[in-house]
Structures are given as C-alpha cells and as structure tokens.
Amino acid sequence: MPTTCLNFTKKCGGCPLLAMPYREQLAQKQARLQELLGGFAPVKAVQGMADPLHYRNKAIASFAAQHGKLVCGLYAEGTHKVLPGADCLLQEDILNKTLAAVLDAARTCRWTAYDEDRGTGLLRHTVLRSSADGKVLVTLVTPGPELPGSKNFCAAMRKKAPWVVSIVQNINPTRTSAVLGNREKTLYGPGFVLDMLCGTQFAISSRSFYQVNRTQTEVLYKKALELAKLTGRETVVDAYCGIGTIGLCAAPQAKQVIGVERNPAAVKDAA
C-alpha cells in the first residue's frame, strides 16, 4: 500500500499498518481468525477490498494551538500531540476537503483550541460523517454551550463546503478522553446526514454507531442474509442494533424485525 501520507512518518495513530502490503494484512487477519475460530468451524478466506483506500465515511480530528495557530488533525500514536491534518489516505476525499474547510472557517472566527490541561479554550474536536452521494454532517465538540460567532461559521461553511448538509454543536464538559458528550445543539440543517446501505436509507447523527466501511459492510450484510435464507415467516431480533442497519436490511425478507438498543439517539435515527 502507498505510504505517501505526510503524517505516516510522524507516527500518526490513525493507520499503523499502512506500510504493510494489503495481502499481508489480509493474511494476518486470516491467521488470527483461524486461531480464534478454527477449533469450532472451518474458516473461509477473508474477502478483501478491491481498493482499500479512502473508504472511511467517518473522521474525528482534534484541535490544538501550535506556534500560535489553530490546527486540527489526528493524534500521534500513544500521545495527545496533534499532527496537523494532511490528506488522510483512509478517509473519503470529501472528508479531507471538509476538514480543511472547518479549520479555515474556525480560524476566520478566531476560535481557540481547548487546552485539556488548563481546561480553557473553545474547540475540542470535530466529527465528520459522509454519505455515499458526497453529503457531510459536521459536528463541533466544545466544553460548554457557548460558541460565539456560530452563525458566521455556518455561513462560511456553506460557501467553502456547500456539500455540508448539517452542522451540530456537541457539548462535552468532561475532562476525559471521551470525544462526544450527551448534549447537542443543531446549528444548521436537520442534525443528520442520510446514507444508503443495501438499498435502504439511514439517518446518521453524530452519536450514532454506523459502520465506517460502507463497501465492505454491504458485502458482509448481503452474505449474512444469503446464509440466513429467510423465507418471510421469521421474526428477526437485531440485538444491540444501533440505528438498525442489519435489521432494516433484513426486513424485506422477514415477517417482522425487533431492534434492541439502549442509546436514545440511535433509536431516534432508526425510527
């Protein structure tokens, strides 16, 4: 696999296996599966991707102040040192473009980065979610509800990144490594992005669990449904269902689907 990422040599914590040939990565996964499951049943070959790059539909970046300037990016491995955002080889291209627009707009608003040691500053993280048709949900994580200039930020984003369909402020006052808090305010748009998976449309919000590899998720779900051999008479229980991707994809082939989930935000998205 290519190692042209500018941050790879700086020990970015995002993809430590980038330098390993993809076939070797698959071989290691195969060996691990054989070790874990081989004693119970035959383990078939791992089905890899045709192009294992730019597949992630979710990006999380942290903000920091470096040399008096606001930056954002991933942490260096094993640290909380932010590596300013180079174009990530795993994220969808639209997310790299959106991240650059978020940083530019935040600088225009003269927002400051949150300092986790002092507990001061405004921006902690940004979380981006993208759809198959190139639409993006932007979430800004702040330590408190104050976000002065948020209207100017939204206006700037609509100009710089017109593919952004919604902007949400997530409030996380805890001094922990958790990215998202439990409170949110929608600043622009519906508060979610719509995506298609196996022919079914899903609403994805910032706190919803959603598979980050859309391509391989469809491969996995279609194979699972093929092996399930549903006849239309079954009741399918989708335990820990999140926004219900498995159950809703199975619904056309089953009598009924029951989803079980404790996260209210995920249940709202599934509905």
Write out the residue ranges for each language-model feature:
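SAM-dependent transferase fold signal centered on methyltransferase-like domains
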Residues: 1-185, 197, 226-233
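Rossmann-like S-adenosyl-L-methionine
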Residues: 149-271
